From Swiss-Prot:
Protein EC: 6.1.1.10
Protein name: Methionine--tRNA ligase
Organism per entry: Serratia proteamaculans (strain 568)
A single Gene Ontology CC term: cytosol
Gene: metG
Cofactor binding comment, as recorded: Binds 1 zinc ion per subunit.
Annotated localization: Cytoplasm
Catalytic activity: tRNA(Met) + L-methionine + ATP = L-methionyl-tRNA(Met) + AMP + diphosphate
Function statement: Is required not only for elongation of protein synthesis but also for the initiation of all mRNA translation through initiator tRNA(fMet) aminoacylation.
Pfam families: Anticodon_3, tRNA-synt_1g, tRNA_bind
Amino acid sequence: MPQVAKKLLVTCALPYANGSIHLGHMLEHIQADIWVRYQRMRGNEVHFICADDAHGTPIMLKAQQLGIKPEEMIAEMSQEHQQDFAGFGISYDNYHSTHSDENRELSNLIYGRLKENGFIKNRTISQLYDPEKGMFLPDRFVKGTCPKCKSPDQYGDNCEVCGATYSPTELIDPKSVVSGATPVLRDSEHFFFDLPSFSEMLQAWTRSGALQEQVANKMQEWFESGLQQWDISRDAPYFGFEIPDAPGKYFYVWLDAPIGYMGSFKNLCDKRGDLDFDEFWRKDSTTELYHFIGKDIVYFHSLFWPAMLEGSNFRKPTNLFVHGYVTVNGAKMSKSRGTFIKAGTYLQHLDADCLRYYYAAKLSSRIDDIDLNLEDFVQRVNADIVNKVVNLASRNAGFISKRFGGQLADKLADPALYQTFVDAAQSIAEAYASRESGRAIREIMALADLANRYVDEQAPWVVAKQEGRDADLQAICSMGINLFRVLMTYLKPVMPSLTERTEAFLNCELSWDSIQQPLLGHQVNPFKALFNRIDLDKVNEMVSASKEDMVAAKVVTGPLAEDPIQDTITFDDFAKVDMRIALITSADFVDGSDKLLKLQLDLGGETRQIFSGIRSAYPDPKALEGRLTIMVANLAPRKMRFGISEGMVMAAGPGGKEIFLLSPDSGAQPGMQVK
């Protein structure tokens, strides 16, 4: 009995519209796309949507810095994001924005229902206010020490170390991220969502199978510590949706951001005309809703979001699929090391399918972090895809094309081996369905090894030289091509670009069910290179370009722009320089020079004579007498036509009249070493 097709709505977390997509973001979108492509291959109806998260103070402030309107900035960012996702083959049916008419309408609707049902409370709160910038500070614009685990440098809404949530006023030693000032408390009326009212429902939903075990266990900790009412409002100035009947008050970005899933789908429904929004979002919906998210936003998606939906009479998610972070070469992504790699930078240097394959090979249904080791990345893709999979086609296709006009044999050379490949479909399907793509890849590569062993044993290059064995040669190579077809069918969710080229070569569409029947007597097209080996030099170029991205992103002005920092030295190099405090006992012009002053320096028991090019900045040298300065005491003496200079005084500035002799703080004495 054929399986009844399911109707699925799938989302990824909404990228924030104030910055570029990087390879850390891409993990989630690739994982979701692999799952979506698999579901489509199995005949399920899938609607895959996303949007830019386009509201909040960070966007407002960045737009101000750029001198443009927030609307203009988010439009440019959306175009860049969509271009990056398309470049990686992410098969979204719709990509929208939270700053949309659909999202405003739905946000107002959900808020109105929550208010009508008694789940919105208002009260006056004391809120952190930046006295220098004249604005209330959003949670993410205050940093301090976590009140729970005491980790420093944590945001004002939740701790990235222990996962705790709290009010910004609970932070220890808070500072404004905007100005660095210490915030002050000011009163303001705010609106709160009554999250504790949903505690019982949320605990039942948590254990319903909607969450991974690791997430469910973490939520239990939050339940035990007690749920708090959630502040859903922000004060002007703010870029977002103004709360109905509350002038100067705006929805907090985390209220309208998840509603953006609904807004994007509503936009798709309106564009298509054959989709029913209510069928997917009404409370008794029989469709399935899946959110792929990172572990850093579990709290919002596992508590606030289902509670908001429940309180406004909409359906809850079927599952949250949570993943870990991406590290590069075993460490946090770093701009200075060039491992903070933008998606666009990657696409300028490498094939998107390479990263898709590498992530797929490492992903599981757990929340483990994924390490993108760049050397292993090169080796694995080349070994698996180039040497095993694509090579299987290339070493057989030449004979089929040249000797048999592209015609495959009418019979299978080894039906039992082919059946082994087909029988693996169920296990690989189960792996894909459960987001165990790493297990699927391992099984596929084990089959690739079998296929290559078959070709090695049959040695078509030897058979080709033997008279009267044309039928054997055609059968062997046709078998190799058929095994390649099965492998590529299994890899289709992972590598869409390679799949497209493969389908062009094989002259047929790759589908899950069609592998039951091998290609017999089938005409294939002339073989062209399907996949290029990764060159480590290309990876290094990408890393170098990522460093350049960082430099370009930071517009350096002032002294650093005119006189950049020189190459790094070791501490041992620095330790060779002996700097001492010196007292200027006399300072005079040098006859015959319009640049130099002659200084006599007392080192506390030793006197030095120094010629220094600071005359233009100190037209009255006598003003320097009696002043403490810093000199390099172990610089080799330099013979000049005016005498011998026995060191160098320290000064800053570009030159000319802008030279500033360095002086130590009060209390320093001649002869003291500067360390």
